Amino acid sequence: MRVMGIDPGSKCTGCGVIDEVNSELKVVYWGSIKTKPRQSFPERLKFIYDELVAVIKEFNPDEIAVEDMFFATNVKSALKLGQTRGVAILSAVNEGKPVAEYSPLEVKQSVVGYGRAEKQQVQDMVTTLLRLKEKPETFDASDALAIAICHIHAATANLKIKTAKGT
């Protein structure tokens, strides 16, 4: 199974692609989509959309996992994040890919074992789990890889449950 994880952000959106074969995880790609501060917000959304579609077309993931919204105290930031998430989900759906969503707590719990882990802890664990020679250049990229790992763990658990039930 090939999974693409997306960590949406209007300034920097992380994306990562991981293959899972015979319970082994192998990183295929990771990167950050950085928008320009002078771009209007709609231009940023279009840029993020176009870049995500290009990654989807290049690496052809079977499924895409997107980080769900966290609690935000700033309404304007929450709205922008929601719109950026919408663009990420739309890029997947328009390319015919199924989408799963996970909260930051679920991702951290799955990857680090602690739902309130710091970004550095997530990055360190992603680097270890994927046996990377170097850490991803941004927390957005390592978070995206963590989201993909979380989805692989969830999909594997769901498959085991279905197999045990005989469905």
Where in this protein do the model-derived segments appear?
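Phosphate- and other anionic-substrate recognition elements at nucleic-acid/protein interfaces
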Residues: 1-167
